[in-house]
């Protein structure tokens, strides 16, 4: 098992290197706040929505912006060791779509079935799945929980952003 140094805020461990995650700005924060509220309202009770949680992905430690996890999820030293049901990455200044795709690929390979990528400045969003497909959302982003679809309306989310 890989041993990690005590993490600093927003520090990830990728490919045996510590990487400082960019700190979010206002649009990122608005979207993250909306997603936490939306998930808290829409998720069945056997799931939790958590922000900025360390997630172990093989030899990496990532910090997705938001994750949905079963209440029965296992932790080691406060880090999530079970796959999330959904990981959400919100683009921050200094990040690229390629950066977020790489992170989603690592999360999916570690067992997370779906990852959403959200780019607030461009009002664009994508779903990345375990089939290694990237699909741009036009009206909604979908996740499946207990064989039931849960759809996030993009227009509802974009309405949280200033014009």
Regions found by a protein language model. Name each.
Residues 1-163:
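Gly/Pro/Ser/Thr-rich low-complexity, intrinsically disordered segments predominantly at protein N-termini
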